[in-house]
Amino acid sequence: MSTDSILTTVPIQWLSVDSPVLPDEVLDWLMELGSMTRRFEQYCNSVRIIPFRECFITEEQLSDENERLLTGQRYWLREIVLCGDNIPWLLGRTLIPETTLTGPDESLVDLGTVPLGRYLFSGNKLTRDYIHVGQQGNRWARRSLLRLSGKPLLLTEVFLPESPVYKR
């Protein structure tokens, strides 16, 4: 199995929310507090998930993400491509500490082609600590520390050029 990440081709430069390079219409997307899947569904007939990588990884395999999560354990890694009407719109990378995968949340390792947002936003046990916004080359990105029943997971999303984020 490859150890390459779907997001590692160009590093993400994390920015301040009030950075002058952030257009208001893009910031509106990046600061979305609800389900990005639901928002994308407003711009297409169907959303589809293509799994890229799903496996457990160790702390040593993390980049700067390790400072955002609990240390000293394994993490469930899920990397996907989200498509709207079969056009790639988003690269997603989810890191879930093994200690988060308890009770009903164990099913997070079995999502397969189900959008993460469908699971996360189906109940009221989700909170968000923060959203960081950034750029990866000419693509916009965001990273959120979410808590599911108080337990952390880190979600990084990179918006691809055909995404409605860039439509004016």
From Swiss-Prot:
The keyword Cytoplasm belongs to this UniProt entry's keyword annotation: yes
EC number(s) on file: 4.1.3.40
Catalysed transformations (reactions): chorismate = 4-hydroxybenzoate + pyruvate
A Pfam family that the UniProt record links to this protein: Chor_lyase
Keyword Cytoplasm belongs to the record: yes
One biological process term in Gene Ontology: pyruvate biosynthetic process
Binding site for substrate: M36, R78, L116, E157
Molecular function (Gene Ontology), one example: chorismate lyase activity
Leading EC class: lyase
InterPro entries in the cross-refs: Chorismate--pyruvate_lyase, Chorismate_lyase_/UTRA_dom_sf
Main location class: cytoplasm
Subunit structure, interactors included: Monomer.
Pathway linked to the protein: Cofactor biosynthesis; ubiquinone biosynthesis
Function summary: Removes the pyruvyl group from chorismate, with concomitant aromatization of the ring, to provide 4-hydroxybenzoate (4HB) for the ubiquinone pathway.
Keywords from the named record: Cytoplasm, Lyase, Pyruvate, Ubiquinone biosynthesis
Protein localization: Cytoplasm
Family in the record: Belongs to the UbiC family.
Protein name, entry field: Chorismate pyruvate-lyase
Source organism: Photorhabdus laumondii subsp. laumondii (strain DSM 15139 / CIP 105565 / TT01) (Photorhabdus luminescens subsp. laumondii)
Lineage of origin: Bacteria, Pseudomonadati, Pseudomonadota, Gammaproteobacteria, Enterobacterales
GO CC annotation, single: cytosol
